[in-house]
Amino acid sequence: MSSSYYVNALFSKYTAGASLFQNAEPTSCSFASNSQRSGYGPGAGAFASSMPGLYNVNSTIYQSPFSSGYSLGSDAYNLHCSSFDQNIPVLCNDLTKPSCEKAEERQPAQPGRGQFRIYPWMRSSGPDRKRGRQTYTRYQTLELEKEFHFNRYLTRRRRIEYAHALCLTERQIKIWFQNRRMKWKKEHKEESSSTPAPNESRQQQRLWRKWKKMKKRRIRESHSRKQSLEITYARDSCKSSL
């Protein structure tokens, strides 16, 4: 046997194994069943053209290990790869959708300059800002009136006790007593200038009568003094004329 026989036999085994490995490797679906690997160089194309039976998809050498046992041909592999290639972008889109939505939820839209929230403490307190009038309940007013009847001025300790008991602040109780004292002074000032009312107590009526009697007595005394002075002056004038 010549050396060329051994070389051809080895070359045929190598090329057949390479072709099977090339078709079985699922590296990329873009490679056809009869495509050439770029790593074999230009010589591989020459050998492949010289032996078309080994590289042909329809040849018996290629179909014997797969088609006999599994009844699968090149079309089945090509269809599987094409369907897988078509589903790749769909799967990628489905996988990236929730991540993109989560990223959008985590990054809320930044408000513009005119959309900032203004809190009450950020607003300026100008002269037009009016404070609401404090309204007291009937129970609070009754308790404060009772205390005012006995004490017109409250101490700090008593004010704190009433603030806790009536659910008010010390400032509110202080203002209420100030207003109540002014009202009381105004009422008593009007009473002193006018006659006593008939519905007042007997003691006040007695005091009023005594004051009237004293006033009349003083008027009488003043008149009597005046008359006595006039009489004495007349007597003196008569004596001087004589």
From Swiss-Prot:
Motif KWKK repeat extents: 183-186, 210-213
Pfam families to which the protein is assigned, alphabetical: Homeodomain
Biased composition (Basic residues): 207-220
Disordered, as annotated region: 187-227
GO biological process: anterior/posterior pattern specification
Chain span(s) of sequence motif Antp-type hexapeptide: 118-123
Database matches in CDD domains: homeodomain
GO MF term (any one): DNA-binding transcription factor activity, RNA polymerase II-specific
UniProt entry keywords in alphabetical sequence: Developmental protein, DNA-binding, Homeobox, Nucleus, Repeat, Transcription, Transcription regulation
DNA-binding region: 129-188
Main subcellular location of this protein, as a coarse class: nucleus
Subcellular location: Nucleus
InterPro entries, alphabetized: Antp_homeobox, HD, HD_metazoa, Homeobox_antennapedia, Homeobox_Antennapedia_CS, Homeobox_CS, Homeodomain-like_sf
GO CC field: nucleus
Tissue: Central nervous system including forebrain.
SUPFAM superfamilies assigned to the protein according to its UniProt record, in alphabetical order: Homeodomain-like
Entry function: Sequence-specific transcription factor which is part of a developmental regulatory system that provides cells with specific positional identities on the anterior-posterior axis.
Family label: Belongs to the Antp homeobox family.
The protein's name in its UniProt record: Homeobox protein Hox-A7
Record organism: Coturnix japonica
